[in-house]
Every structure is written in structure tokens, then in C-alpha cells.
Amino acid sequence: RGQRVRMVEVSVITAAYNSAGVIERNIRSVAAQSLPPKEHIIIDDGSIDDTASVVEALRSEFPYVRIISQSNSGAARARNAGIAAATGRFVAFLDSDDTWSELKLATQIGFMTDNSVLFSYGDYQDIDTATETVLGRHEAPERLTYSDLLRGCPIGCLTVAFDQAALGKHFMPDVRRGQDWGFWLQLTRDGTVGRRYPGCHACYHRAGGSLSAAKFSKAVDIYRIYREQEQFGPARSLYYLLPHVVGAWTKRPVRYDEG
């Protein structure tokens, strides 16, 4: 199996904005994978710091790293630029301030190829950016269908990979928040079932601060996805929006001292 997995081509997509202080950690996290990617595409979304120069300086060490520069347009357009450029069979996402364990790609892609899975995700840790301490672990469901995803998004983008050779090119809806969830809806609408790969191999580095305004804006964008992408009427859109709103205010990671 190991040799077969090593022959699989993976494109890693990283959206970056003013990430000069963290992008090297991200690049080295991908470089440390026991299953090396075919390419690591970094989209500099109009940064006004030294993000691009840090990436360029590392390209001699990691020649498979590619950088795409664009005016500031948001995460959806940045990731879409990466998807458009991706040439690997599998596409995986890792934003600039997040990291993976060395076994993430090998575990995930091995699981997908062994089980004919086209869309997969996994658990991830919350890391406090200021102290680098582990806050807890987000546990993903074993399976996700389109119907499940209509009621919420219980997975993290940093854990996801999909088989673009089988599913084709798909692009995220052009909203500032919730674009990844809208993308998972696209991947599963035809009956494709998402599956959880084993272990916990991703780390989400969380900054502090109030998220109240962000949660309201995200709710608006989620409503737009129901209306514009899924073509639901107002009443049906509001019906499905409610679990998102409740979840946004109650969701928290499983903390290790809770078992």
C-alpha cells in the first residue's frame, strides 16, 4: 500500500493574508509530510507585509512551492485561485496559520485510496496562538451526507481533501464567511458521502478576541448560500440556518480533561 499511496499526487492549497510571521511554519509543516505533496500552492491575497518575500525565499529549499499573488479578495477567491491551478489528483486545504502532523497526508490519502473515498476530513486540535497550548479537540462525525451538511458544518477546512480527478473542479461560493461549507455542499449534492479519516493530524491556531460580529456576518453569508447556490426559498433557508446560529454560539472543542 505504501508505494501505491506515494504515487498519488496531492495539491496543497494555502490562502495567506499578512502571514509573514507564520507562513514559514506552515510551509515546513507541509514539507515534513511523510507523503510529500506534488505542489504547495500559496495564494497571497493582497498582503501588505512580507508574506510574498518570505515564501519566495523558501522556494529554493522547497521547489514544489508555488505562489500566486492577487489583490485582496477574501478566502473564497484565494482558495478558488488555488483550485484552478491545482494539478494533483487530490486537493487538500491548509490556511497559512495552521499546521499538520507529519502523518496527515499519508493517513488521509491512504484511507481514501483504500476505501474509495472521494471526500474526507478529520479531527483537529485547537491551539492558543499566544501560549501554544492545546485548548481541546474537535471531533468530526464518521460520515457526512448532503442532508447532514444542510444542517451545519461540523468539520474544519484544514482537515479536508477531495479527489478532484473523480469529482471534477469545484469552486467555493464567493462569500466572505462559510465558503468552505458551501463547497462541501457542492461535493456531496450528487450523493458523495464524506468520511472521517482516523487520528487527529491537524492544528488550528486560534487567536483571541470577540467573534460576535463575525458570527452575525457568517450567518448572513450562510443564508446567501442557501438562497443563491442551493436555490432554496426564504422560509426553507431560515429553517436550515437556525442550527448554524445555535451551533455558532454553543460549539466548543472537547477538552482533554473531559475525557
Language model segments and positions:
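Conserved donor NDP-sugar-binding/catalytic core segment of glycosyltransferases
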Residues: 103-134
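Short aromatic/hydrophobic "clamp" motif used to bind/position activated sugar donors
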Residues: 91
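Glycine-rich, basic loop-to-helix element that forms the pyrophosphate-binding segment
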Residues: 70-86, 107
